[in-house]
Curated annotation (Swiss-Prot):
GO biological process, any: cell division
SUPFAM superfamilies: Homing endonucleases
Gene responsible for this protein: whiA
Lineage summary: Bacteria, Bacillati, Bacillota, Clostridia, Moorellales
Function in brief: Involved in cell division and chromosome segregation.
Keyword terms: Cell cycle, Cell division, DNA-binding
Name by which UniProt lists this protein: Probable cell division protein WhiA
Chain segments annotated as coiled-coil in the UniProt record: none
Membrane spanning residue stretches: none
Any Pfam family matching the protein: HTH_WhiA
Length: 317
């Protein structure tokens, strides 16, 4: 049973099928393959293993580029260890190791043009790179055998408005990106557009989920505040009824007090719609604040401290 490919391998499968438009870009990609792919000249006769990989798409890509730019016959060999496991593909050139090294020496440094730089970065990523799935920890990295090559790539990436960090590890020098926008830019530069879409879809989903959570939290906070306020107002109303008496309150205050006692969780708008005739939020708020003020006055001075205002008047017959 075949195991599903990881996001990193899916990205490499996609990049292995990208063909640069210009010959200079294709050559830059081949240079990255040969520099980082562990050339092996210990073959019988005048042969050099240019590249070894278990992935056929990548072997085909290196084979195609080598045939285009190397002035020697190139072929692909595959083998299985004792007939088991995945096949290993070797791209072999009929040329001595020194000839290949001389060809590389004539193309030292990093490419000059942005399109060639992107192709070179794609080749390097296909050989030594990896990228985490977008739903996990954001991380893209490239591994180099020495500080000089890592420094060259770091400079190239900086020219492409990327800011990779450099770290020394046991397996070599690692350039890595942690920022999701930087990773998306790197994938886009290399031509991994399906991977970019996958990344952006996950980021959009995360953003929408965060927005929903913020709205829910805000609504919850508002609801909690409304309920707490309603309970406090209901407690003040019960205190007034117990001290100054229900009939001692003006009719407008008696009406809102009765509704608030029945619905301590209701909002100002909902309370206003329960009155006859309905009253707006500001009117409801004014009456409730008036009740709270009366409750404070009575608590401070007793029943004698409460004198109904003319605008709300004394109880009417």
């Amino acid at each position: 049973m075949l195991m599903p490919l990881s996001f990193s391998l899916q990205t490499k499968e996609e990049l292995a099928r990208v063909k640069a438009r210009h010959p200079c870009c294709r050559q830059a990609e081949l240079v990255a393959f040969l520099r980082l792919g562990n050339l092996d000249g210990g073959q019988p006769g005048e042969e050099t293993v240019l590249f070894t990989t278990p992935y056929p798409a990548l072997a085909r890509k290196v084979y195609s580029l080598a045939r285009e730019f190397l002035a020697c016959p190139v072929k692909v060999r595959n083998s299985r260890r004792q007939g088991k496991g995945r096949p290993v593909f070797r791209v072999v050139a009929r040329a001595r190791l020194k000839e290949i090294q001389d060809w590389l020496a004539g193309r030292a440094g990093v490419p000059e043009y942005p399109c060639c730089q992107a192709a070179y970065m794609r080749g390097a990523f296909l050989v030594t790179g990896s990228v985490n799935k977008p739903s996990g920890t954001h991380h893209l990295e490239l591994i180099f055998p020495d500080a000089a090559m890592a420094g060259q790539m770091q400079g190239l990436m900086q020219q492409q408005e990327l800011e990779p960090r450099l770290s020394r590890r046991q397996r070599g020098y690692v350039l890595y990106l942690k920022d999701s926008e930087q990773i998306i830019r790197a994938l886009s530069l290399m031509g991994a557009y399906s991977a970019v879409l996958a990344y952006e879809n996950v980021l959009i989903f995360k953003d929408m989920r965060n927005r929903v959570n913020r709205l829910v939290n805000c609504e919850t906070a508002n609801l909690t505040k409304t309920v707490e306020t309603g309970l406090r107002q209901a407690e003040n109303i019960r205190y007034l009824i117990a001290t100054v008496g229900w009939d001692y309150l003006p009719p407008a205050l008696r009406e809102i007090a009765a509704v608030r006692l029945q619905h301590p969780e209701a909002s100002l708008k909902e309370l206003g719609e329960m009155l006859h005739p309905p009253v707006g939020k500001s009117g409801v708020n004014h009456r409730l604040r008036r009740l709270e003020l009366i409750a404070r006055q009575v608590r401070g001075q007793g029943r004698e401290g409460y004198a109904p205002d003319d605008d709300l008047s004394r109880p009417r017959a």
